[in-house]
Amino acid sequence: MVILGIDPGYGRIGYGVLEKKGNMFNLIDYGVIYTSKEDELPKRLLNIDEQLRNLIETYKPDESAVEKLYFFKNVATAIQVGEARGVILLCLEKENIPIYEYTPFQIKQAVTGYGRAEKGQIQRTLKLLLKLEKTPTPDDAADALATAFCHGNFRRSFKNAGY
């Protein structure tokens, strides 16, 4: 099963692609979709949609895992990220890719065993779990990998529970 993990954002959208075979995870790719600050909102949202469709076409994920939004102090940022997240969910739905959503707490818990883990701890743990040569960066890409990993672990639980 190929899992596309996504860390929603407005200027930077992290993505991570993992293949899960049995209990093993294999890294396929990870990175960041960037949008230009010079572009107006509709152009930035279109850019997210186009780049995400390219990823879907390239990797053909079976399922997707998207990080849920959490509390933002800056309302304008929260609205922008919410708009970008809407484009992401719509794109995945149009491509008939099942969408699973996880809170930051669930993701941290699945990767490190501690729901309040710091970003550095998550990155170091991912490096070990995925047998990477270097720590995954930037944060957005690492968060997306963690989201995909979380889904892979929860997916096993879903299967064992008969879902």
Curated annotation (Swiss-Prot):
Binding site for Mg(2+) 2: 67
Catalytic site positions: 7, 67, 140
Reaction catalyzed: Endonucleolytic cleavage at a junction such as a reciprocal single-stranded crossover between two homologous DNA duplexes (Holliday junction)
Compartment(s) of residence: Cytoplasm
UniProt remark on cofactor binding: Binds 2 Mg(2+) ion per subunit.
Enzyme class: hydrolase
A Gene Ontology cellular-component term: Holliday junction resolvase complex
GO biological process, one term: DNA recombination
Primary residence: cytoplasm
UniProt-annotated binding residues for Mg(2+) 1: 7, 140
Cofactor: Mg(2+)
Subunit structure: Homodimer which binds Holliday junction (HJ) DNA. The HJ becomes 2-fold symmetrical on binding to RuvC with unstacked arms; it has a different conformation from HJ DNA in complex with RuvA. In the full resolvosome a probable DNA-RuvA(4)-RuvB(12)-RuvC(2) complex forms which resolves the HJ.
Function: The RuvA-RuvB-RuvC complex processes Holliday junction (HJ) DNA during genetic recombination and DNA repair. Endonuclease that resolves HJ intermediates. Cleaves cruciform DNA by making single-stranded nicks across the HJ at symmetrical positions within the homologous arms, yielding a 5'-phosphate and a 3'-hydroxyl group; requires a central core of homology in the junction. The consensus cleavage sequence is 5'-(A/T)TT(C/G)-3'. Cleavage occurs on the 3'-side of the TT dinucleotide at the point of strand exchange.
Protein name as it appears in the record: Crossover junction endodeoxyribonuclease RuvC
Gene designation per UniProt: ruvC
